[in-house]
Amino acid sequence: MVNQFQVTVLLGGRSAEREVSLRSGAAVARALRALGHGVDEVDPAVESWGLPAKTEVVFLALHGEYGEDGQVQSRLETLGVPYTGTNAVGSALAFDKARSKEIFQQNQVASPRGVLIDSPTSTPPDTIPAPWILKPATQGSSVGLNLVEDEVGWNVALADSLRHGGTVLCEECIQGRELTVGVLDGVALPVVEVRPK
């Protein structure tokens, strides 16, 4: 028999990915209830950000800023409440694409060439040939991500990416498949291919 827990699912939030989080959080809550767990759903953007007193564990279904950037994780760690996912420091480092890139370079992990841009009047970098990928340095998923084929589309794409964050990472475009590997307690899980619809 599986132990039953009182789980609080954090969903929604105030990021650009709110709608996705509401859907995924509702699906998580349904699945947990089907397994016999007690479930409360809390939306930090709507309710006073507090946890029900009976909470034993928090399932993080928040996305983007405040959900994946270490802020909510830090708060839960301060409260001493166990939660799903990466700790506050790991979340903050992974969410910041520029800091992640530095860590990759320090550990000889290959990643596309890139430069940081924070000015709307910046021109395409001479060191990276087109096409370019522009993305906010601190946003989740593909929020504000733009594929720029040539200099003609540069200004519009840069303005869009900057609108979603104050700093943009410009990288060379690498054609290929998107693969991801989760890590659980230091053990790499099987490789999964991401295939957007």
Give residue spans per PLM region:
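Phosphate-binding site of ATP-dependent enzymes
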Residues: 149-197
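ATP-binding N-terminal substructure of ATP-dependent carboxylate-amine bond-forming enzymes
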Residues: 1-102, 106, 118-125
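Conserved beta-strand scaffold positions in the cores of enzyme catalytic domains, especially
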Residues: 41, 83, 111-114, 145
